[in-house]
């Protein structure tokens, strides 16, 4: 049986715009960089998730020193402290490296944590003894892709640029979702906010209007890849 080439993956690659926010034709989504909307969306999701994790802490912080001034230390609940925000922001963009490119999904949904369906399919083929040639060693398959590395760098840039806005939200506007306050209110023009409305349902639509689970699609992809060896010049990091 011949090696499975990247061309077979074109059956499951989808379409979306590039960093400038300008939509492209559907044929062009196999190789692209994340949009500004996608960067802001993931930054907001990661920060709110981390703050949600620490929000129920009953710890009380003591601030200031008594010494000879006669002033008492201030007691501030950790849940509303600047310390909590600083700790949530620490290594925030590093956590973006936990994401993978799920090329079988549309738009901003292609960026999600965990192994992509496509990569799971390819590893399943390898376990079955099929020779899969991605042009890189097997041990490098799980390294962060160019897209994810770009996401992380742009996250750092955006966080530095809008640090004061994030602080304003934390101390004064937490009744609003951060995604709305930061991305829609400060980072993006109204014409570039479409990705914020995209949500993942866990199911994919197929042509006859029925729905297919990821497990069913993975089995079908393995069968297609096994039976249809094709050559391609596409970057393996799109997986």
UniProtKB/Swiss-Prot annotation:
Residues spanning the signal sequence: 1-20
GO CC terms of this entry: extracellular region
Superkingdom per UniProt: Eukaryota
InterPro entries: DUF3456
Disulfide linkage: 37-195, 40-183, 93-155
Subcellular location: Secreted
GO molecular function, one term: signaling receptor binding
Acidic residues bias spans: 213-225
Annotated keywords: Disulfide bond, Secreted, Signal
Composition bias type Basic and acidic residues, residue spans: 201-212
Stretch list, region Disordered: 199-239
Role played: Plays a role in the regulation of the cell surface expression of TLR4.
Similarity comment: Belongs to the canopy family.
Subunit-level organization: Interacts with TLR4.
Protein name: Protein canopy homolog 4
Source organism of the structure: Bos taurus
Gene coding for it: CNPY4
